[in-house]
């Protein structure tokens, strides 16, 4: 950073530039020191009604969003910790497309896709390496379909449903649905 330039200034400028190019509603950049995990800079912008961008909310810690691929790690940890699979267990990733069928009406309740076709039958280790959505979903469905609470309880045992206690104000509350949740859906949760 240049003399007199506040920490995070370049990140703010880069974020604002990308938001303007894509006309996104909001965005966030987090610069972390890999060796220590220390957060070096955070930049956040929200588009206002007039179309310009202003700092309004710290999306890095406040916004609730689907965890995406990072949640696959917790999924595989659960499967391995409960001895449902080992790394050589096989899973059919169906060339990157898997439809969960609603048993009540036979319609597709949820379509799961992978970014790339990594093949058919592969090991759980390879499915994890390929970050296969289909592999993770099929393994969870196969091993927890009859007792989904066993899966969610294991996730809770990792404290994933608790706040981290960050030193930055505004941390959001994580939420992992379980079979006792009012909006639980066995096919999609």
Q: Could you describe each region identified by the protein language model?
A:
Residues 1-28, 48-51:
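Extracytoplasmic/periplasmic proteins that interact with beta-lactams or build/remodel peptidoglycan
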Residues 5, 27-65, 77-189:
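Beta-lactam-recognizing serine transpeptidase/beta-lactamase-like catalytic domain environment
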């Amino acid at each position: 950073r240049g003399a007199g330039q506040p920490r995070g200034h370049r990140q703010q400028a880069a974020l604002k530039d990308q938001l303007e190019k894509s006309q996104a509603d909001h965005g966030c950049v987090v610069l972390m020191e890999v060796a220590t995990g220390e957060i070096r800079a955070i930049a956040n912008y929200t588009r206002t009604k007039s179309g310009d961008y202003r700092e309004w909310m710290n999306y890095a810690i406040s916004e609730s969003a689907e965890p995406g691929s990072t949640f696959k790690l917790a999924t595989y940890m659960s499967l391995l910790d409960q001895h449902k699979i080992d790394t050589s267990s096989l899973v059919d990733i169906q060339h990157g497309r898997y439809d969960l069928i609603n048993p009540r009406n036979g319609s597709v309740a949820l379509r799961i896709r992978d970014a790339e076709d990594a093949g058919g039958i592969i090991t759980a280790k390879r499915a994890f390496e390929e970050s296969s959505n289909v592999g993770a979903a099929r393994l969870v469905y196969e091993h927890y379909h009859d007792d989904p609470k066993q899966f969610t309880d294991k996730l809770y045992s990792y404290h994933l449903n608790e706040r981290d206690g960050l030193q930055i104000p505004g941390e959001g509350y994580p939420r992992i649905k379980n079979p006792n949740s009012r909006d639980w859906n066995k096919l999609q949760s």
